[in-house]
Regions:
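A short, N-terminal amphipathic alpha-helix
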Residues: 31-48, 296-307, 335-342
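Substrate-recognition element of Asp-dependent hydrolases with the DxDx(T/V) motif
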Residues: 52, 296, 300-336, 346-350
Length: 350
């Protein structure tokens, strides 16, 4: 399976860390984050890579070459095959896909080059193939869902709604965010209605035609039954700001990055709900009665930072008693996730 890595961002938000190199070349413990991505892929058999580059892209191309040489950082072979598409003009974060579409003849992985991750990609791809959809999104909870795009899906993982940052959202929602890793069938490019030849050319508005991955290619598939989400607690973190970069550095040093890969056994804390997370009110039937216990969010935040999974296991007899429906219970849990997210905490599963 081919891997397309989007490495064309300017990284203006993280320029204080390194302004003279592309964001994917910023180092984590002496090795560029992009090299760590490539090693994670190569170790799992994904060694056929296309990189889309633009801003300072020559630095990336000079460093990795065609993937057949040794790493300047480690002295070890990259062990992959790399091709490049250089954007002379910005095409948006998905415009380059239309320029390389002849090379994309079957499902491919599409990844961002500026995220730190350690993921079981074979498990991810197997999920995609089992669902037989056009797209599978890698989704996870994060510590700031209030300013992130949210994915709403049914119980089978079919994406029903894609709520971008600017979209109106319900009062309470599940903390499920697109992590920027995707498996995509190239048919998505065909059905988008976008003319590949027009991308990069001057449009009717006098500006070059660009393509936005989320808004123009993926979001329109919500509700069609052709796009699914793959929920995973594995480590994927954007390094777009200095704060997040230093957080990633700390996580790597402490072993939290590799430790979250689902090829490894996981450490977890299982939490009761009533009286542990929310104030005990007996049989909780009304969503308005759900209130977090003071100090719970900071405590769960410490679990999130520890490398342990935070999983809620709760017995709800109000279901058996017919006093609360499954949909109403889900809304109560959405409130729990929303309130925790507002304080920077999240649950890996309920």
């Amino acid at each position: 399976m081919k891997v397309v890595i989007m490495a064309g961002g300017k990284g203006t938000r993280i320029s204080s860390v390194a302004s003279d190199i592309p964001k994917p070349m910023i180092k984590i413990e002496g090795i560029p984050v992009l090299e760590r991505e490539i090693k994670c892929l190569k170790d799992q058999g994904f060694d056929d890579i296309i990189m889309t580059v633009s801003h300072l892209g020559n630095i990336i191309m000079d460093y990795f070459g065609d993937g057949s040489e040794n790493s300047p950082a480690t002295g070890k072979p990259f062990g992959v095959h790399i091709e490049y598409y250089f954007e002379k003009e910005p095409l948006g974060n998905a415009g380059a896909l239309f320029k390389i579409k002849d090379k994309l003849t079957s499902d491919f992985l599409l990844l961002n080059a500026d995220a730190m991750f350690d993921v079981d990609f074979n498990r991810f791809v197997a999920f995609h193939r089992k669902r037989d959809g056009l797209v599978t999104l890698f989704t996870h909870p994060n510590s700031h869902p209030y300013d992130s795009g949210l994915i709403v899906a049914d119980k089978n993982g079919a994406v029903e709604k894609w709520l971008a940052k600017e979209d109106a959202r319900p009062q309470y929602y599940r903390n499920r965010v697109n992590a920027g890793l995707h498996v995509i069938n190239p048919k998505v490019l065909e059905i988008s209605g976008i003319d590949a030849d027009s991308v990069g050319k001057i449009g009717e508005d006098g500006k070059p035609v660009k393509v936005d991955l989320d808004r123009q290619l993926l979001k329109p598939l919500a509700g069609t039954g052709k796009m699914f989400c793959y929920d995973s607690p594995e480590y994927v973190k954007d390094m777009g700001t200095p704060e997040r970069y230093y957080s990633v550095c700390s996580d790597y040093k402490e072993g939290r990055v590799s430790g979250k890969n689902l090829r490894n056994k996981q450490k977890a804390l299982f939490l009761d709900r009533d009286g542990t997370i929310n104030k005990y009110v007996g049989f909780l039937r009304n969503i308005d009665d759900f209130e977090l216990i003071d100090g719970v969010a900071p405590a769960i935040q410490k679990i999130n930072e520890s490398g342990y999974l935070a999983i809620v296991v709760t017995n709800q007899p109000v279901i058996a008693r017919g006093e609360v429906s499954f949909d109403e219970l889900e809304e109560i849990h959405n409130k729990m996730e929303t309130l925790l997210g507002k304080e920077g905490a999240y649950l890996d599963a309920i």
